[in-house]
Amino acid sequence: MNKTLTTLFALAVASVTAFSHAQEAKGDVEAGKQKIAMCIGCHGIPGYQASFPEVHRVPMISGQNAKYIAAALVAYQKGERKHPTMRGIATSLSEQDIADMAAYYEQHGKKGADLPAKPSREPSVQVAELLKKGACVSCHGDNFAKPIDPSYPKIAGQHSDYLFVALKAYKADARNPNLGRSNAIMGGISKQFTNAELKALANYIGSIDGDLQVVPQSRFR
């Protein structure tokens, strides 16, 4: 592992430790079920697309790690993730709301046999080199569905267009008040790649089997 990736891995461990200390609220699945009406309007509609900062399918969050969902919502609250709709929603939530909603979505994923330890399909030679360069498995796991810590996302099978938009957001200039995601780890990694390379990574990771899914739901229950 080169010096840059070694430094980023150290930052990853430090950030996980810091977040685990900060997160104290315990999530309640049943309470979360009563709080997700605002989420269903986008994340509960198969194929639903957002238009900011460009058109892409909204991420699948059913089956995602609760700690990651909570961390993402806190990042929107703080403005570390820049998205007008998500910031407006996140700032309306209490710490307990976030914990409850995250707990609900974590158990809402695909059911059945465990995923294999390795991805369901092999990458091309080009993509394999890109994955190695980014050391993606170091945090997201060998099959991209079992990250080293639950405050990191499962990305296997996630919508490829969403992954591409997210990766580009990490590359964005941190001084831009309207666009981007502030994350030292992912920022350092994503800036090593061209947008074409990021798209190739996103297309591969989005094509493999994962736990995530969209569960169609009505807001009127």
Regions found by a protein language model. Give the residues of each.
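N-terminal signal peptide c-region/cleavage motif recognized by signal peptidases
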Residues: 15-19
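Inter-heme linker and motif-flanking segments adjacent to c-type heme-binding CXXCH motifs
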Residues: 46-53, 79-82, 107-125, 129, ...
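C-terminal capping alpha-helices of c-type cytochrome domains
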Residues: 91-114, 188-217
